[in-house]
Protein backbone atom coordinates (compact mmCIF):
# COMPACT_ATOMS: atom_id res chain seq x y z
CA UNK A 1 0.00 0.00 0.00
CA UNK A 2 1.40 3.36 -1.03
CA UNK A 3 1.74 5.75 1.88
CA UNK A 4 -0.38 8.88 1.44
CA UNK A 5 1.15 12.26 2.19
CA UNK A 6 -0.70 13.82 5.09
CA UNK A 7 -2.46 17.15 4.77
CA UNK A 8 -1.69 19.44 7.69
CA UNK A 9 -5.40 19.28 8.59
CA UNK A 10 -4.78 15.57 9.33
CA UNK A 11 -2.19 16.46 11.98
CA UNK A 12 -3.21 17.09 15.58
CA UNK A 13 -1.56 18.41 18.73
CA UNK A 14 -2.65 16.31 21.72
CA UNK A 15 -2.26 16.07 25.48
CA UNK A 16 -3.47 13.93 28.38
CA UNK A 17 -4.24 14.91 31.95
CA UNK A 18 -3.97 11.92 34.27
CA UNK A 19 -5.05 11.03 37.78
CA UNK A 20 -2.68 11.88 40.65
CA UNK A 21 -3.70 11.22 44.26
CA UNK A 22 -2.27 9.63 47.40
CA UNK A 23 -1.80 5.86 47.57
CA UNK A 24 -3.15 5.25 44.09
CA UNK A 25 -2.75 1.77 42.64
CA UNK A 26 -4.05 2.65 39.20
CA UNK A 27 -3.90 5.73 37.00
CA UNK A 28 -6.20 6.89 34.22
CA UNK A 29 -6.70 9.71 31.75
CA UNK A 30 -9.35 12.13 33.06
CA UNK A 31 -9.00 14.67 30.25
CA UNK A 32 -7.66 14.22 26.71
CA UNK A 33 -7.41 17.16 24.33
CA UNK A 34 -6.66 17.54 20.64
CA UNK A 35 -6.65 20.30 18.07
CA UNK A 36 -5.96 20.11 14.34
CA UNK A 37 -3.30 22.30 12.80
CA UNK A 38 -4.66 25.60 11.45
CA UNK A 39 -7.67 25.35 13.74
CA UNK A 40 -8.51 26.55 17.24
CA UNK A 41 -11.35 24.08 17.72
CA UNK A 42 -10.01 22.20 20.76
CA UNK A 43 -11.84 18.98 21.57
CA UNK A 44 -11.64 17.64 25.12
CA UNK A 45 -12.67 14.10 26.03
CA UNK A 46 -13.24 12.71 29.51
CA UNK A 47 -11.40 9.43 28.93
CA UNK A 48 -8.77 7.86 26.69
CA UNK A 49 -11.18 5.53 24.83
CA UNK A 50 -13.43 8.34 23.57
CA UNK A 51 -10.30 10.23 22.51
CA UNK A 52 -9.03 7.22 20.55
CA UNK A 53 -12.41 6.44 18.99
CA UNK A 54 -12.62 10.01 17.67
CA UNK A 55 -9.62 9.27 15.44
CA UNK A 56 -10.68 5.70 14.60
CA UNK A 57 -13.93 7.11 13.21
CA UNK A 58 -12.06 9.37 10.80
CA UNK A 59 -11.80 7.80 7.36
CA UNK A 60 -8.20 8.77 6.87
CA UNK A 61 -4.74 8.33 8.29
CA UNK A 62 -3.94 10.91 10.94
CA UNK A 63 -0.86 11.93 12.87
CA UNK A 64 -0.95 12.90 16.54
CA UNK A 65 1.81 14.79 18.31
CA UNK A 66 2.28 14.55 22.07
CA UNK A 67 4.92 16.70 23.76
CA UNK A 68 6.78 14.02 25.74
CA UNK A 69 5.45 10.75 24.38
CA UNK A 70 7.45 8.92 27.05
CA UNK A 71 4.70 9.92 29.49
CA UNK A 72 1.50 9.90 27.41
CA UNK A 73 2.61 6.89 25.38
CA UNK A 74 2.48 4.63 28.43
CA UNK A 75 -1.27 5.27 28.70
CA UNK A 76 -1.72 4.53 24.99
CA UNK A 77 0.21 1.24 25.14
CA UNK A 78 -1.69 0.18 28.25
CA UNK A 79 -5.03 0.85 26.54
CA UNK A 80 -3.95 -0.95 23.36
CA UNK A 81 -3.06 -4.04 25.41
CA UNK A 82 -5.88 -4.11 27.94
CA UNK A 83 -8.83 -2.05 26.62
CA UNK A 84 -8.98 -2.00 22.86
CA UNK A 85 -7.96 -5.54 21.91
CA UNK A 86 -5.05 -4.60 19.64
CA UNK A 87 -2.11 -6.94 19.07
CA UNK A 88 1.59 -6.04 18.76
CA UNK A 89 2.96 -6.04 15.18
CA UNK A 90 6.00 -8.12 16.01
CA UNK A 91 7.04 -11.68 15.22
CA UNK A 92 8.55 -14.12 17.70
CA UNK A 93 11.29 -15.99 15.84
CA UNK A 94 12.24 -19.61 16.66
CA UNK A 95 15.48 -18.43 18.31
CA UNK A 96 13.48 -16.25 20.71
CA UNK A 97 14.31 -12.98 18.97
CA UNK A 98 11.65 -10.41 18.16
CA UNK A 99 11.26 -8.90 14.69
CA UNK A 100 9.21 -5.81 13.85
CA UNK A 101 6.62 -6.16 11.07
CA UNK A 102 6.96 -3.49 8.37
CA UNK A 103 4.35 -0.73 8.10
CA UNK A 104 2.90 -2.10 4.84
CA UNK A 105 2.52 -5.62 6.28
CA UNK A 106 0.76 -4.60 9.49
CA UNK A 107 -2.64 -6.24 9.95
CA UNK A 108 -5.77 -4.41 11.13
CA UNK A 109 -5.97 -3.83 14.89
CA UNK A 110 -2.22 -4.10 15.42
CA UNK A 111 0.34 -1.63 16.72
CA UNK A 112 4.06 -1.12 17.04
CA UNK A 113 6.31 1.50 18.56
CA UNK A 114 9.79 2.94 18.38
CA UNK A 115 11.42 3.08 21.83
CA UNK A 116 15.21 2.94 22.13
CA UNK A 117 16.99 0.82 24.72
CA UNK A 118 17.92 4.13 26.39
CA UNK A 119 14.20 4.75 26.97
CA UNK A 120 13.70 7.38 24.27
CA UNK A 121 10.17 7.23 22.83
CA UNK A 122 9.87 8.27 19.17
CA UNK A 123 6.55 7.07 17.78
CA UNK A 124 3.66 4.62 17.99
CA UNK A 125 1.98 3.28 14.82
CA UNK A 126 -1.56 1.87 15.12
CA UNK A 127 -3.19 0.10 12.15
CA UNK A 128 -6.95 0.46 12.67
CA UNK A 129 -8.04 -1.16 9.40
CA UNK A 130 -6.59 -2.27 6.09
CA UNK A 131 -6.26 1.26 4.76
CA UNK A 132 -5.70 3.49 7.76
CA UNK A 133 -3.20 4.12 10.52
CA UNK A 134 -2.93 6.45 13.47
CA UNK A 135 0.64 7.74 13.72
CA UNK A 136 1.66 9.09 17.11
CA UNK A 137 4.87 11.15 17.25
CA UNK A 138 6.86 12.80 20.03
CA UNK A 139 7.09 16.52 19.25
CA UNK A 140 9.73 16.88 21.97
CA UNK A 141 12.19 15.18 19.59
CA UNK A 142 11.58 17.86 16.95
CA UNK A 143 11.23 20.79 19.38
CA UNK A 144 13.42 19.94 22.41
CA UNK A 145 12.00 22.49 24.86
CA UNK A 146 9.33 22.40 27.53
CA UNK A 147 5.95 23.77 26.43
CA UNK A 148 6.52 26.80 28.65
CA UNK A 149 9.86 27.60 27.00
CA UNK A 150 8.48 26.71 23.57
CA UNK A 151 5.66 29.22 23.86
CA UNK A 152 8.01 31.90 25.14
CA UNK A 153 10.78 31.36 22.57
CA UNK A 154 8.47 31.00 19.58
CA UNK A 155 6.17 33.80 20.68
CA UNK A 156 2.98 31.75 20.36
CA UNK A 157 -0.36 33.51 20.84
CA UNK A 158 -1.26 31.03 23.56
CA UNK A 159 1.05 30.36 26.50
CA UNK A 160 1.26 27.49 28.96
CA UNK A 161 -0.73 28.00 32.16
CA UNK A 162 -0.31 26.57 35.67
CA UNK A 163 -2.59 24.05 37.38
CA UNK A 164 -2.50 21.88 40.49
CA UNK A 165 -2.05 18.30 39.28
CA UNK A 166 -2.90 16.54 42.52
CA UNK A 167 -6.49 15.91 43.52
CA UNK A 168 -9.16 13.25 43.31
CA UNK A 169 -10.12 13.02 39.65
CA UNK A 170 -11.30 10.10 37.54
CA UNK A 171 -12.37 9.36 33.94
CA UNK A 172 -15.39 11.45 32.92
CA UNK A 173 -15.24 13.46 36.14
CA UNK A 174 -16.61 17.02 36.09
CA UNK A 175 -14.04 19.55 34.87
CA UNK A 176 -13.79 23.20 35.80
CA UNK A 177 -13.45 25.95 33.17
CA UNK A 178 -9.95 26.59 34.55
CA UNK A 179 -8.97 22.96 33.92
CA UNK A 180 -10.35 23.08 30.39
CA UNK A 181 -8.47 26.31 29.74
CA UNK A 182 -5.25 24.75 31.02
CA UNK A 183 -5.33 21.67 28.80
CA UNK A 184 -6.59 23.71 25.83
CA UNK A 185 -3.64 26.04 26.07
CA UNK A 186 -1.23 23.09 26.22
CA UNK A 187 -2.38 21.76 22.84
CA UNK A 188 -2.72 25.23 21.31
CA UNK A 189 0.88 26.13 22.20
CA UNK A 190 2.06 22.87 20.62
CA UNK A 191 -0.17 23.37 17.57
CA UNK A 192 1.26 26.83 16.92
CA UNK A 193 4.83 25.57 17.33
CA UNK A 194 4.23 22.73 14.85
CA UNK A 195 2.64 25.14 12.37
CA UNK A 196 5.75 27.31 12.52
CA UNK A 197 8.07 24.35 11.89
CA UNK A 198 5.93 22.81 9.14
CA UNK A 199 5.52 26.14 7.35
CA UNK A 200 9.30 26.06 6.83
CA UNK A 201 9.25 22.43 5.67
CA UNK A 202 10.67 21.04 8.92
CA UNK A 203 8.60 17.90 9.51
CA UNK A 204 11.07 15.09 10.28
CA UNK A 205 10.70 12.80 13.29
CA UNK A 206 13.59 14.48 15.16
CA UNK A 207 15.44 17.77 14.91
CA UNK A 208 18.65 15.84 14.17
CA UNK A 209 17.01 14.06 11.23
CA UNK A 210 15.67 17.38 9.97
CA UNK A 211 19.15 18.92 10.16
CA UNK A 212 20.66 16.03 8.21
CA UNK A 213 17.88 16.17 5.60
CA UNK A 214 18.46 19.90 5.13
CA UNK A 215 22.24 19.52 4.94
CA UNK A 216 21.96 16.72 2.39
CA UNK A 217 19.60 18.80 0.24
CA UNK A 218 22.14 21.64 0.27
CA UNK A 219 25.12 19.36 -0.41
CA UNK A 220 24.05 16.56 -2.73
CA UNK A 221 24.44 17.35 -6.43
CA UNK A 222 22.47 14.32 -7.59
CA UNK A 223 25.61 12.92 -9.21
CA UNK A 224 26.88 10.87 -6.28
CA UNK A 225 28.70 13.59 -4.34
CA UNK A 226 27.00 12.66 -1.06
CA UNK A 227 27.86 8.98 -1.37
CA UNK A 228 31.46 9.72 -2.37
CA UNK A 229 31.97 12.10 0.56
CA UNK A 230 30.05 10.14 3.20
CA UNK A 231 29.97 6.41 2.34
CA UNK A 232 28.69 3.81 4.79
CA UNK A 233 31.92 2.71 6.49
CA UNK A 234 30.13 0.00 8.46
CA UNK A 235 29.84 -1.89 5.16
CA UNK A 236 33.61 -1.65 4.55
CA UNK A 237 36.31 -3.87 6.08
CA UNK A 238 38.59 -2.25 8.64
CA UNK A 239 41.11 -3.99 10.86
CA UNK A 240 41.19 -5.99 14.10
CA UNK A 241 38.20 -7.96 12.80
CA UNK A 242 36.02 -4.85 12.77
CA UNK A 243 34.36 -2.88 10.01
CA UNK A 244 35.94 0.48 9.20
CA UNK A 245 33.06 2.25 10.94
CA UNK A 246 33.29 0.13 14.09
CA UNK A 247 37.06 0.64 14.35
CA UNK A 248 36.91 4.43 13.87
CA UNK A 249 34.00 4.70 16.30
CA UNK A 250 36.37 3.68 19.11
CA UNK A 251 37.94 7.15 18.79
CA UNK A 252 34.62 8.94 19.31
CA UNK A 253 34.22 10.81 22.62
CA UNK A 254 32.08 13.63 23.95
CA UNK A 255 32.91 17.02 25.38
CA UNK A 256 35.63 17.93 27.88
CA UNK A 257 33.98 18.30 31.28
CA UNK A 258 36.69 18.70 33.93
CA UNK A 259 37.06 20.06 37.47
CA UNK A 260 40.60 21.02 38.35
CA UNK A 261 42.18 18.67 40.85
CA UNK A 262 41.94 19.87 44.45
CA UNK A 263 39.16 22.39 43.70
CA UNK A 264 36.11 20.37 44.72
CA UNK A 265 34.06 22.13 47.39
CA UNK A 266 36.47 25.07 47.67
CA UNK A 267 34.87 28.53 47.60
CA UNK A 268 36.59 30.77 45.05
CA UNK A 269 36.21 34.47 44.42
CA UNK A 270 35.97 37.13 41.72
CA UNK A 271 35.74 34.98 38.62
CA UNK A 272 34.58 34.92 35.03
CA UNK A 273 32.72 32.35 32.94
CA UNK A 274 33.48 32.35 29.21
CA UNK A 275 31.38 30.45 26.66
CA UNK A 276 32.23 29.59 23.07
CA UNK A 277 29.79 31.00 20.55
CA UNK A 278 28.27 27.87 18.97
CA UNK A 279 31.18 25.52 19.68
CA UNK A 280 30.36 22.71 17.25
CA UNK A 281 29.32 24.93 14.31
CA UNK A 282 32.50 26.96 14.96
CA UNK A 283 34.66 23.86 14.70
CA UNK A 284 32.81 22.67 11.58
CA UNK A 285 33.18 25.98 9.72
CA UNK A 286 36.20 26.72 7.52
CA UNK A 287 37.05 29.84 9.55
CA UNK A 288 38.31 27.42 12.23
CA UNK A 289 40.92 26.16 9.76
CA UNK A 290 39.77 22.59 10.44
CA UNK A 291 39.93 20.00 7.67
CA UNK A 292 37.52 17.06 7.71
CA UNK A 293 37.93 13.49 6.47
CA UNK A 294 35.85 12.44 3.47
CA UNK A 295 35.54 9.30 1.39
CA UNK A 296 37.05 5.92 2.16
CA UNK A 297 39.80 5.07 4.69
CA UNK A 298 43.22 3.64 3.92
CA UNK A 299 44.29 1.28 6.69
CA UNK A 300 47.76 0.18 7.75
CA UNK A 301 49.16 -2.13 10.41
CA UNK A 302 52.43 -1.62 12.25
CA UNK A 303 54.37 0.79 14.45
CA UNK A 304 54.53 3.76 12.09
CA UNK A 305 52.45 6.46 10.40
CA UNK A 306 52.77 6.23 6.61
CA UNK A 307 53.97 9.23 4.61
CA UNK A 308 50.62 9.36 2.81
CA UNK A 309 48.93 10.07 6.15
CA UNK A 310 51.30 12.92 7.04
CA UNK A 311 51.12 15.05 3.90
CA UNK A 312 48.86 18.09 3.59
CA UNK A 313 45.09 17.56 3.46
CA UNK A 314 45.12 14.27 5.32
CA UNK A 315 43.42 13.16 8.54
CA UNK A 316 44.31 9.99 10.40
CA UNK A 317 43.09 7.82 13.27
CA UNK A 318 45.37 5.69 15.46
CA UNK A 319 45.27 2.70 17.74
CA UNK A 320 48.16 3.37 20.14
CA UNK A 321 49.48 1.31 23.05
CA UNK A 322 51.30 3.48 25.57
CA UNK A 323 51.96 4.44 29.15
CA UNK A 324 51.41 8.09 30.05
CA UNK A 325 51.83 10.63 32.81
CA UNK A 326 50.70 14.25 32.79
CA UNK A 327 53.46 16.81 32.35
CA UNK A 328 53.93 19.38 35.09
CA UNK A 329 51.55 22.32 34.67
CA UNK A 330 49.39 20.57 32.05
CA UNK A 331 45.71 19.63 32.04
CA UNK A 332 44.55 16.08 31.22
CA UNK A 333 42.87 15.07 27.96
CA UNK A 334 42.87 11.23 28.06
CA UNK A 335 39.71 9.35 29.01
CA UNK A 336 39.42 5.56 28.85
CA UNK A 337 36.05 3.85 28.50
CA UNK A 338 35.12 0.23 29.24
CA UNK A 339 38.09 -0.50 31.49
CA UNK A 340 38.08 -2.12 34.92
CA UNK A 341 41.17 -0.11 35.83
CA UNK A 342 39.96 3.45 35.16
CA UNK A 343 36.80 5.47 35.80
CA UNK A 344 35.06 6.03 32.48
CA UNK A 345 34.19 9.68 33.30
CA UNK A 346 37.63 10.65 34.62
CA UNK A 347 40.21 12.62 32.63
CA UNK A 348 43.36 10.76 33.59
CA UNK A 349 46.66 12.12 34.81
CA UNK A 350 48.47 8.80 34.47
CA UNK A 351 48.10 5.25 33.25
CA UNK A 352 49.81 4.14 36.46
CA UNK A 353 47.64 2.56 39.13
CA UNK A 354 48.29 4.07 42.58
CA UNK A 355 51.41 5.62 41.12
CA UNK A 356 52.87 2.26 40.08
CA UNK A 357 53.18 0.22 36.92
CA UNK A 358 50.80 -2.69 37.45
CA UNK A 359 50.01 -6.00 35.84
CA UNK A 360 46.64 -7.36 36.85
CA UNK A 361 44.91 -10.60 35.85
CA UNK A 362 41.97 -10.10 33.52
CA UNK A 363 39.49 -12.30 31.68
CA UNK A 364 41.62 -12.17 28.52
CA UNK A 365 45.01 -12.48 30.19
CA UNK A 366 47.21 -9.84 31.81
CA UNK A 367 46.00 -6.23 32.00
CA UNK A 368 48.83 -3.73 32.36
CA UNK A 369 49.02 -0.01 33.01
CA UNK A 370 50.20 0.41 29.44
CA UNK A 371 46.87 1.13 27.80
CA UNK A 372 45.30 0.97 24.37
CA UNK A 373 44.01 4.28 23.03
CA UNK A 374 41.96 4.89 19.89
CA UNK A 375 42.49 8.52 18.98
CA UNK A 376 42.01 11.07 16.24
CA UNK A 377 44.96 12.89 14.75
CA UNK A 378 43.81 15.98 16.69
CA UNK A 379 43.72 14.06 19.98
CA UNK A 380 47.16 12.57 19.36
CA UNK A 381 48.78 15.94 18.78
CA UNK A 382 47.33 17.27 22.05
CA UNK A 383 48.23 14.12 24.00
CA UNK A 384 51.88 14.50 23.01
CA UNK A 385 51.81 18.12 24.22
CA UNK A 386 50.21 17.30 27.57
CA UNK A 387 51.80 13.97 28.59
CA UNK A 388 55.06 12.15 29.02
CA UNK A 389 54.72 8.88 27.08
CA UNK A 390 56.62 5.61 27.34
CA UNK A 391 56.53 2.14 25.77
CA UNK A 392 54.58 3.74 22.93
CA UNK A 393 53.64 1.53 20.00
CA UNK A 394 51.30 2.29 17.11
CA UNK A 395 49.29 -0.87 16.52
CA UNK A 396 47.38 0.21 13.41
CA UNK A 397 45.57 3.16 11.90
CA UNK A 398 43.86 4.64 8.88
CA UNK A 399 43.97 7.91 6.99
CA UNK A 400 41.57 9.90 4.84
CA UNK A 401 41.75 12.62 2.28
CA UNK A 402 40.24 15.84 3.62
CA UNK A 403 38.21 18.86 2.62
CA UNK A 404 37.72 22.20 4.34
CA UNK A 405 34.42 24.06 4.33
CA UNK A 406 32.17 21.06 3.67
CA UNK A 407 29.66 22.37 6.22
CA UNK A 408 29.97 26.08 5.32
CA UNK A 409 26.89 26.48 3.12
CA UNK A 410 24.67 24.94 5.80
CA UNK A 411 26.21 26.84 8.72
CA UNK A 412 26.36 30.17 6.86
CA UNK A 413 22.70 29.85 5.90
CA UNK A 414 21.43 29.36 9.45
CA UNK A 415 23.99 31.71 11.01
CA UNK A 416 22.73 34.49 8.74
CA UNK A 417 19.13 33.78 9.73
CA UNK A 418 20.08 33.78 13.41
CA UNK A 419 22.09 37.00 13.13
CA UNK A 420 19.43 38.91 11.18
CA UNK A 421 16.43 37.54 13.09
CA UNK A 422 14.07 40.24 14.27
CA UNK A 423 12.13 37.89 16.53
CA UNK A 424 13.00 35.20 19.04
CA UNK A 425 11.08 32.54 17.10
CA UNK A 426 13.26 32.79 13.99
CA UNK A 427 16.41 32.94 16.08
CA UNK A 428 15.41 29.88 18.13
CA UNK A 429 14.79 27.73 15.04
CA UNK A 430 18.06 28.82 13.41
CA UNK A 431 19.92 27.99 16.61
CA UNK A 432 18.35 24.51 16.65
CA UNK A 433 19.67 23.85 13.14
CA UNK A 434 23.14 25.14 13.96
CA UNK A 435 23.54 22.98 17.05
CA UNK A 436 22.00 19.66 16.01
CA UNK A 437 23.73 18.58 12.79
CA UNK A 438 27.03 17.37 14.24
CA UNK A 439 25.47 14.57 16.29
CA UNK A 440 23.95 12.92 13.22
CA UNK A 441 27.42 12.46 11.73
CA UNK A 442 28.27 10.15 14.65
CA UNK A 443 25.07 8.10 14.53
CA UNK A 444 25.78 4.36 14.86
CA UNK A 445 24.07 1.32 13.33
CA UNK A 446 22.53 0.42 16.70
CA UNK A 447 18.78 0.10 16.20
CA UNK A 448 18.09 -1.84 19.40
CA UNK A 449 14.62 -1.28 20.81
CA UNK A 450 12.38 -2.06 23.74
CA UNK A 451 9.61 -4.64 23.44
CA UNK A 452 6.64 -4.40 25.81
CA UNK A 453 4.92 -7.47 27.25
CA UNK A 454 1.87 -7.58 29.54
CA UNK A 455 2.64 -8.13 33.23
CA UNK A 456 0.36 -7.83 36.28
CA UNK A 457 -2.20 -5.53 34.60
CA UNK A 458 0.61 -3.33 33.31
CA UNK A 459 3.60 -4.15 31.09
CA UNK A 460 7.35 -4.57 31.25
CA UNK A 461 10.01 -3.81 28.66
CA UNK A 462 12.68 -6.14 27.32
CA UNK A 463 15.65 -4.93 25.28
CA UNK A 464 15.85 -6.35 21.75
CA UNK A 465 19.25 -5.89 20.14
CA UNK A 466 19.50 -4.96 16.46
CA UNK A 467 22.01 -3.23 14.18
CA UNK A 468 20.33 -2.27 10.94
CA UNK A 469 20.12 1.53 11.09
CA UNK A 470 21.74 3.70 8.42
CA UNK A 471 24.72 5.20 10.26
CA UNK A 472 26.27 8.64 10.06
CA UNK A 473 29.76 9.29 8.75
CA UNK A 474 31.73 8.57 11.93
CA UNK A 475 35.12 9.99 10.77
CA UNK A 476 33.52 13.46 10.67
CA UNK A 477 31.55 12.87 13.86
CA UNK A 478 34.69 11.88 15.75
CA UNK A 479 36.80 14.67 14.26
CA UNK A 480 34.21 17.35 15.11
CA UNK A 481 34.10 16.46 18.81
CA UNK A 482 37.89 16.07 18.87
CA UNK A 483 38.46 19.55 17.43
CA UNK A 484 35.92 20.90 19.96
CA UNK A 485 37.62 19.26 22.96
CA UNK A 486 41.00 20.58 21.92
CA UNK A 487 39.62 24.10 21.41
CA UNK A 488 38.27 24.16 24.98
CA UNK A 489 41.30 22.44 26.53
CA UNK A 490 43.76 24.87 24.94
CA UNK A 491 41.71 27.81 26.25
CA UNK A 492 41.67 26.30 29.74
CA UNK A 493 45.41 25.58 29.54
CA UNK A 494 46.15 29.21 28.62
CA UNK A 495 44.45 30.28 31.86
CA UNK A 496 45.85 27.57 34.14
CA UNK A 497 48.66 28.99 36.28
CA UNK A 498 49.21 26.18 38.77
CA UNK A 499 47.29 24.53 41.59
CA UNK A 500 47.93 27.25 44.15
CA UNK A 501 47.22 30.26 41.93
CA UNK A 502 44.03 31.82 40.57
CA UNK A 503 43.10 30.74 37.07
CA UNK A 504 41.19 27.98 35.34
CA UNK A 505 38.91 26.03 37.69
CA UNK A 506 36.28 24.15 35.71
CA UNK A 507 35.19 23.42 32.13
CA UNK A 508 32.03 21.97 30.65
CA UNK A 509 32.26 21.26 26.91
CA UNK A 510 31.96 24.83 25.62
CA UNK A 511 32.73 26.91 28.71
CA UNK A 512 35.62 27.68 31.03
CA UNK A 513 35.22 29.03 34.56
CA UNK A 514 38.21 30.91 36.02
CA UNK A 515 38.69 32.78 39.29
CA UNK A 516 40.12 35.66 37.28
CA UNK A 517 38.62 39.04 36.35
CA UNK A 518 37.73 39.47 32.64
CA UNK A 519 40.84 41.50 31.82
CA UNK A 520 43.08 38.65 32.99
CA UNK A 521 41.48 35.94 30.83
CA UNK A 522 44.06 35.12 28.15
CA UNK A 523 44.52 32.93 25.10
CA UNK A 524 41.02 33.41 23.70
CA UNK A 525 39.40 35.75 21.17
CA UNK A 526 36.51 37.60 22.78
CA UNK A 527 33.43 38.54 20.77
CA UNK A 528 29.78 38.19 21.72
CA UNK A 529 28.63 36.59 18.43
CA UNK A 530 31.43 35.56 16.05
CA UNK A 531 32.28 31.89 15.47
CA UNK A 532 35.48 30.56 17.06
CA UNK A 533 35.24 33.33 19.68
CA UNK A 534 34.36 33.38 23.35
CA UNK A 535 31.66 35.42 25.01
CA UNK A 536 32.36 36.58 28.57
CA UNK A 537 28.96 35.42 29.69
CA UNK A 538 29.09 36.20 33.39
CA UNK A 539 31.20 37.43 36.27
CA UNK A 540 30.71 36.18 39.81
CA UNK A 541 31.95 37.26 43.23
CA UNK A 542 31.83 33.74 44.74
CA UNK A 543 31.49 30.22 43.38
CA UNK A 544 31.86 26.62 44.45
CA UNK A 545 32.50 23.70 42.07
CA UNK A 546 31.75 20.24 43.46
CA UNK A 547 32.14 17.86 40.51
CA UNK A 548 31.31 17.62 36.83
CA UNK A 549 28.13 19.58 36.02
CA UNK A 550 27.60 20.47 39.68
CA UNK A 551 28.39 24.00 40.86
CA UNK A 552 26.97 27.32 42.10
CA UNK A 553 28.07 30.77 40.97
CA UNK A 554 26.86 34.02 42.57
CA UNK A 555 26.57 36.10 39.41
CA UNK A 556 27.04 39.88 39.55
CA UNK A 557 27.46 40.69 35.84
CA UNK A 558 26.03 39.30 32.60
CA UNK A 559 27.89 40.19 29.40
CA UNK A 560 30.09 42.48 31.55
CA UNK A 561 27.02 44.55 32.54
CA UNK A 562 26.02 44.75 36.25
CA UNK A 563 22.86 42.83 37.22
CA UNK A 564 20.96 42.23 40.43
CA UNK A 565 23.13 39.46 41.93
CA UNK A 566 21.70 35.95 41.75
CA UNK A 567 22.77 32.36 42.37
CA UNK A 568 23.18 30.21 39.26
CA UNK A 569 22.76 26.61 40.44
CA UNK A 570 23.85 23.72 38.22
CA UNK A 571 23.52 20.12 39.40
CA UNK A 572 23.21 17.24 36.95
CA UNK A 573 19.78 15.65 37.35
CA UNK A 574 18.42 18.33 39.72
CA UNK A 575 14.98 19.44 38.49
CA UNK A 576 13.80 23.05 38.53
CA UNK A 577 11.59 22.54 41.60
CA UNK A 578 14.53 21.22 43.66
CA UNK A 579 16.64 24.19 42.57
CA UNK A 580 13.86 26.56 43.66
CA UNK A 581 13.75 24.95 47.11
CA UNK A 582 17.53 25.04 47.54
CA UNK A 583 17.67 28.64 46.38
CA UNK A 584 14.94 29.80 48.77
CA UNK A 585 16.81 28.04 51.58
CA UNK A 586 20.04 29.87 50.68
CA UNK A 587 18.32 33.24 50.34
CA UNK A 588 16.11 32.85 53.41
CA UNK A 589 12.97 33.59 51.40
CA UNK A 590 11.04 30.35 52.04
CA UNK A 591 7.32 30.64 52.81
CA UNK A 592 5.29 27.90 54.46
CA UNK A 593 2.36 28.70 52.18
CA UNK A 594 4.46 27.79 49.13
CA UNK A 595 5.41 24.32 50.38
CA UNK A 596 3.68 21.70 48.24
CA UNK A 597 4.60 18.63 50.29
CA UNK A 598 5.54 17.67 53.83
CA UNK A 599 9.05 17.04 52.50
CA UNK A 600 9.24 20.63 51.21
CA UNK A 601 8.24 21.91 54.65
CA UNK A 602 10.78 19.74 56.45
CA UNK A 603 13.55 20.82 54.07
CA UNK A 604 12.86 24.53 54.50
CA UNK A 605 11.72 24.84 58.13
CA UNK A 606 12.61 23.52 61.58
CA UNK A 607 10.44 24.38 64.59
CA UNK A 608 8.79 27.09 62.51
CA UNK A 609 12.08 28.79 61.64
CA UNK A 610 13.70 28.92 58.23
CA UNK A 611 16.67 26.62 57.67
CA UNK A 612 19.48 28.64 56.12
CA UNK A 613 21.89 26.84 53.78
CA UNK A 614 25.26 27.92 52.40
CA UNK A 615 27.91 26.60 50.02
CA UNK A 616 28.98 24.29 52.85
CA UNK A 617 25.73 22.36 52.38
CA UNK A 618 26.26 21.93 48.63
CA UNK A 619 28.15 18.66 48.98
CA UNK A 620 27.65 14.97 48.13
CA UNK A 621 24.86 13.62 50.29
CA UNK A 622 22.68 16.73 49.95
CA UNK A 623 19.03 15.66 49.58
CA UNK A 624 16.49 18.10 48.17
CA UNK A 625 12.80 17.30 47.61
CA UNK A 626 11.05 18.27 44.41
CA UNK A 627 12.11 15.48 42.07
CA UNK A 628 9.48 13.39 40.31
CA UNK A 629 10.20 9.73 39.58
CA UNK A 630 8.15 7.95 36.90
CA UNK A 631 6.62 4.68 38.10
CA UNK A 632 4.62 2.41 35.81
CA UNK A 633 1.39 1.05 37.32
CA UNK A 634 -1.83 -0.30 35.79
CA UNK A 635 -3.24 2.32 33.43
CA UNK A 636 -0.01 4.14 32.67
CA UNK A 637 2.61 6.09 34.60
CA UNK A 638 2.55 8.21 37.74
CA UNK A 639 5.18 10.70 38.85
CA UNK A 640 6.08 10.01 42.47
CA UNK A 641 7.58 12.67 44.70
CA UNK A 642 11.12 11.83 45.68
CA UNK A 643 14.43 13.51 46.53
CA UNK A 644 17.26 14.70 44.37
CA UNK A 645 20.39 13.31 46.02
CA UNK A 646 23.83 14.63 45.17
CA UNK A 647 26.05 11.61 44.61
CA UNK A 648 29.78 11.26 44.94
CA UNK A 649 31.52 11.57 41.56
Residue ranges of model-derived segments:
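Conserved acidic
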Residues: 6-7, 26-30, 36-64, 74-649
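Two-metal-ion RNase H-like nuclease active-site motif
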Residues: 9-20, 272-274
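N-terminal leader/early-domain signal
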Residues: 1-4, 8-9, 14, 138
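Conserved Walker A/P-loop ATP-binding site and its immediately adjacent core
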Residues: 69-73
Amino acid sequence: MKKRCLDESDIFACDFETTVFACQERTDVWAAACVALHSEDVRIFGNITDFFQFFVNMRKTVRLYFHNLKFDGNFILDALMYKWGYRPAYLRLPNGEVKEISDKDMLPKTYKYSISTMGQWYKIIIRTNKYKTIEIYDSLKLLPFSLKVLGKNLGTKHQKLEMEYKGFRFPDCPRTPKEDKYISNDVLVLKEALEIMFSQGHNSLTIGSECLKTYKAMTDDGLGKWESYFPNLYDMPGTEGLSAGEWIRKSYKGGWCYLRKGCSGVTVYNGTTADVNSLYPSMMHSMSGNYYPVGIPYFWNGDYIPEDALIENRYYFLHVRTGFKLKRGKLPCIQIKNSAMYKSTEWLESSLIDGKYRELPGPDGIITSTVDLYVTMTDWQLIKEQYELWDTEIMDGCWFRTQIGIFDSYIDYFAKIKKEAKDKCTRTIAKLFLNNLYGKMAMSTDSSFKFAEPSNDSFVFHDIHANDKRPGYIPCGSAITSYARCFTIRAAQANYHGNNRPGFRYADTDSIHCDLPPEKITGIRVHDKDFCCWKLESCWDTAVFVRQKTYIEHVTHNDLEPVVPYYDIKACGMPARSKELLLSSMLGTAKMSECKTVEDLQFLFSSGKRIMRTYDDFIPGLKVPGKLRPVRIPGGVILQDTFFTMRNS
